[in-house]
């Protein structure tokens, strides 16, 4: 993962298909994956494309631990 900008704050959150955003860093199997892009699928599911090139499809009820960078004002 890249160094974090000094003007950003990291916030631990739980994400779902409805709340996941580009740039979120999701913890899977003890590894961190940054969301590069996401695609809406039928019935509220989403497919996440990570910077590593890997894909993950999440259902509407899937809940994942993540870190979201918040910019300071």
PLM region descriptions:
Residues 2-10, 55-73:
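Intrinsically disordered, low-complexity, charged/polar segments
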Residues 19-20:
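Short, well-ordered loop/turn sites that connect or cap secondary structure elements
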Residues 32-60:
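Basic/aromatic-rich interaction segments and small domains that mediate binding to polyanionic partners
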